[in-house]
Amino acid sequence: MRPVGLRELLSIRVDVAPIVDLGGGRRYVPFDGGTFEGRDGLAGTILRGGVDWQQVRADGVIEIDAHYALASTEREAVEVRSRGLRAASPEVAARLSRGDAVDPDEYYFRTHVRFTTSAPRLDWLNSILAVSTGRRDRDVVTIDVHEVL
């Protein structure tokens, strides 16, 4: 069996607005911008208007479905789709909800990430799978993305 490897791809820092509660465990988090930086000269901004749709399950686990766009420093657009889970003990979840600083080792925040772009320089992003680890702070989510080799 061939093992799966990972290679650092980029770090995304998303500025988030307050959560909008839709009831029944459904909610969303609007993206207000942000930045990204990574290997091979990848850098730029997070465009406003992205959203992280969430379902808070009965067991407290949050199902994540984020859809947003990046704009590179070369003005290349990249669509990002990220799905995953954030799980924490009730105590840690309460601290996160209050906006307290919480060590990311105290909770599980993982997603799989797909990219779509028509930019020739970044075409290779269309052909990779990626996974990420996340960190939630008061008004910022930091996502460290790794290419699956």
Give residue spans per PLM region.
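Beta-strand-enriched cores of mature, soluble protein domains
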Residues: 1-149
